[in-house]
């Protein structure tokens, strides 16, 4: 197997300086948003004055908040690491669909095997946590009650995993994880982007696949469930708004789980290396920043957000419509890709929605051997799945109202991520497909919203 250590100037995310800024800045931002939620009624905390003394007091106050409310206790380590270990055991032992990844050029076109059983892991975890809750062994409200300490543990664990994976790859290569791949030569940038493409322990425990669904989306869902249970214990009922975030996070976790085999041939799996960017975001960023809608509802009396029936119903309709487009659009794209590569697998996992699979799809057969889908949802907009995904995220914030900016962090951040991702996708598609991509844009002229943009 040939080595692919190629030293080149870092380009994405501002190179090493940008990577370092993200690696230090985002954990700080997470703590700041959490402190605003817990200690300042979900409003931004500001310095008393824009002087040296004012900023000193500002940072001293934040440090105190973190110490008293987010200290990484031994129990928090036990809870978080136990959750990860149990998920790893399920990953290796529960039944699922076996499939293969895309041919990897740096591994002589080898196609790695994958066992896709996240859907079994999801519902098994629900049953286990339900039993532990009713037997008082482990209250599911722990996920929301210990939000701060668990967030700290997730952040620490993400940094540790990044360091171990980066150094292990450089020192031991595929004897431990995987061979170094597309290195820039700058250790900060390479740790951020990743030193290897497909790190594994053994033949089936693929770290990238493991962190893709089970850690971020499962924990996010259980944070919301914990909030719902705590609200029921406090008020004797669960508000429609808290039920909404539970539904939204359930739909997303379930969608990622039931379509796990469709993740295998995606760009993330076949090209994106596994470093701090993916490790931190999946382990800490997703569950502990996308949940600010839940934190707001949890920390306020339901009377504060007792919206009109019309408003609440409208947000429910928005969520369900966007979810339908999101689910079926991604299903169409990935089923088509699997058909092309001969890895098509039909599963009956819930929910099976109409128009999930396109019969007799139309597509462009490109000069480089690739294909570009021109039917289904993509006939109307080339990135319509991003549009649906964004409006789902926006609905999670809209259900909280407009009294706090914190729930809107996720949709605002996600919008920036999507714009960056789309610009990167277009640039790479133009380079990869050339004139065929121009023809694709002619047939499918709209990017996000049909007949508008």
UniProtKB/Swiss-Prot annotation:
Q: Write out the GO biological process terms.
A: ergosterol biosynthetic process
- Locate the transmembrane regions by residue number: 13-33, 77-97, 118-138, 153-173, 209-229, 278-298, 311-331, 399-419
Recorded phenotype for the gene knockout or disruption: Abolishes the production of ergosterol and accumulates ergosta-5,7,22,24(28)-tetraenol. Leads to susceptibility to cycloheximide and to staurosporine, but does not affect tolerance to nystatin and to amphotericin B. Leads to cold-sensitivity, a supersensitivity to divalent cations and several unrelated drugs including staurosporine, caffeine, chloramphenicol, sorbitol, and SDS. Does not lead to a sensitivity to nystatin, amphotericin B, thiabendazole or hydroxyurea.
Q: Which positions make up the signal peptide?
A: none
Tell me yes or no: is Nucleus among this UniProt entry's keywords: no
Top EC class, one word: oxidoreductase
- Coiled coil stretches, renumbered: none
Cell location: Endoplasmic reticulum membrane
Topology of this chain in the membrane? Multi-pass membrane protein
Its Enzyme Commission number(s) read 1.3.1.71
- What is catalyzed by this enzyme? ergosterol + NADP(+) = ergosta-5,7,22,24(28)-tetraen-3beta-ol + NADPH + H(+)
Q: Which UniProt keywords apply?
A: Endoplasmic reticulum, Lipid biosynthesis, Lipid metabolism, Membrane, NADP, Oxidoreductase, Steroid biosynthesis, Steroid metabolism, Sterol biosynthesis, Sterol metabolism, Transmembrane, Transmembrane helix
Recorded hits in InterPro entries, A to Z, give: ERG24_DHCR-like, Sterol_reductase_CS
The molecular function terms in GO held by this entry are:
Delta24(24-1) sterol reductase activity
Where along the chain is NADP(+) bound? 333, 337, 373, 385-386, 425, 429-433, 440
Pathway(s) of this molecule? Steroid metabolism; ergosterol biosynthesis
GO cellular component terms listed in the entry, alphabetical order: endoplasmic reticulum membrane
Q: Which family does this protein fall into?
A: Belongs to the ERG4/ERG24 family.
Quote additional remarks. In Aspergillus, the biosynthesis pathway of the sterol precursors leading to the prevalent sterol ergosterol differs from yeast. The ringsystem of lanosterol in S.cerevisiae is firstly demethylised in three enzymatic steps leading to the intermediate zymosterol and secondly a methyl group is added to zymosterol by the sterol 24-C-methyltransferase to form fecosterol. In Aspergillus, lanosterol is firstly transmethylated by the sterol 24-C-methyltransferase leading to the intermediate eburicol and secondly demethylated in three steps to form fecosterol.
User: What function is annotated for this protein?
Assistant: Erg4 catalyzes the last step of ergosterol biosynthesis by converting ergosta-5,7,22,24(28)-tetraen-3beta-ol into ergosterol. The third module or late pathway involves the ergosterol synthesis itself through consecutive reactions that mainly occur in the endoplasmic reticulum (ER) membrane. Firstly, the squalene synthase erg9 catalyzes the condensation of 2 farnesyl pyrophosphate moieties to form squalene, which is the precursor of all steroids.
| PANTHER family named among the record's database cross-references | DELTA(14)-STEROL REDUCTASE, DELTA(24(24(1)))-STEROL REDUCTASE ERG4
> Per its record, how is this protein called by name?
Delta(24(24(1)))-sterol reductase
Q: State the organism named in the record.
A: Schizosaccharomyces pombe (strain 972 / ATCC 24843) (Fission yeast)
Gene name of this polypeptide:
sts1
